[in-house]
């Protein structure tokens, strides 16, 4: 693949965290580095083990292939390969691949002399994954509380986990996470629409500037966050959504064991609701 006109001058040696100059090269447009090799190794090994699991399961249908964690009776110990051991090794591979990819992003940032915002953001995705397959199962005492690797089976796990604690929508951290997800979608949809509007003016007119974009929202709602500010806001909203998604899971079954609707009894029991005729406490 041909280099872009400006690309070659940014391909400079150095900035590596591990391995020195050994893997400090590119394959086409892709920077390799030690962590690129590590990512490939972990990803390839994980895929091979998933294929092995498919052989043991007796199906090659992608919708039916599923790698299950060990049964609850194994606790936090190792399990035979066919009874959850493959899931444990694949989880190690997935974690290794994700962390290596993030560190590869760090090396690219070091080469370009830019901030570490991208690997920092990706670290939140890793946090969410590890919450489900490592932190929460360890806190609950068994790998069997983690989700299986399968298209349909992991959806069944989500449903079963939710209904185990009643209506999961009453989980306050879940409420906050969903609010951030929707707000993030709204903010970035408005941002994308605004940029496309400025880039596609009426026929015969020049492309509009950020001043036009700012003026639109000042006219609309009285305030514009600005071209840089909207990206800061988008990052804040998206990271908050991921953080509270992880939080809503880590507190379920570890510090809260009942149905989530019961958590809201503190609201019902507030003194100013008491003795209201026809009210819940009346």
Curated annotation (Swiss-Prot):
Q: Where does a ubiquinone bind?
A: 217
In alphabetical order, the GO MF annotations are: bacteriochlorophyll binding; electron transporter, transferring electrons within the cyclic electron transport pathway of photosynthesis activity; metal ion binding
Q: Which GO terms describe its cellular component?
A: plasma membrane light-harvesting complex; plasma membrane-derived chromatophore membrane
**Keywords carried by this UniProt record:** Bacteriochlorophyll, Chlorophyll, Chromophore, Electron transport, Iron, Magnesium, Membrane, Metal-binding, Photosynthesis, Reaction center, Transmembrane, Transmembrane helix, Transport
Residues binding Fe cation, per UniProt: 191, 231
GO biological process, alphabetically ordered: photosynthetic electron transport in photosystem II
CDD domains on file: Photo-RC_L
Taken from the record, one Pfam family name reads Photo_RC
Query: What family classification does the UniProt entry report for this protein?
Result: Belongs to the reaction center PufL/M/PsbA/D family.
Q: What name is this protein filed under? A: Reaction center protein L chain
Protein species of origin: Cereibacter sphaeroides
């Amino acid at each position: 693949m041909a280099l872009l006109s400006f690309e070659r001058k940014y391909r400079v040696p150095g900035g590596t965290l591990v391995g020195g100059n050994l893997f400090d090269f590119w394959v086409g447009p892709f920077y390799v580095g030690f962590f690129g090799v590590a990512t490939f190794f972990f990803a390839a090994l994980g895929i091979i083990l998933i294929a092995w699991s498919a052989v043991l399961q007796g199906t090659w249908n992608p919708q039916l292939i599923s790698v299950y964690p060990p049964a609850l009776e194994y606790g936090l110990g190792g399990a035979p390969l066919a009874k959850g051991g493959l899931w444990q090794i694949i989880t190690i591979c997935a974690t290794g691949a994700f962390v290596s990819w993030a560190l590869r992003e760090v090396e690219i940032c070091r080469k370009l002399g830019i901030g570490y915002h991208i690997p920092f953001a990706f670290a939140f995705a890793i946090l969410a994954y590890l919450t489900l397959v490592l932190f929460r199962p360890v806190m609950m005492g068994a790998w069997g509380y983690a989700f299986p690797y399968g298209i349909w089976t992991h959806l069944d796990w989500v449903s079963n986990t939710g209904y185990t604690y009643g209506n999961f929508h009453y989980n306050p951290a879940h409420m906050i996470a969903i609010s951030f997800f929707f707000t993030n979608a709204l903010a970035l949809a408005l941002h994308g629409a605004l940029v496309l509007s400025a880039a596609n003016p009426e026929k015969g007119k020049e492309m509009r500037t950020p001043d036009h974009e700012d003026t639109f929202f000042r006219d609309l709602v009285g305030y514009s966050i600005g071209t840089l500010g909207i990206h800061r806001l988008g990052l804040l909203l998206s990271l908050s959504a991921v953080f509270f998604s992880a939080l809503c899971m880590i507190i379920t079954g570890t510090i809260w064991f009942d149905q989530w609707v019961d958590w809201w009894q503190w609201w019902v029991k507030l003194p100013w609701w008491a003795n209201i005729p026809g009210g819940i406490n009346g």
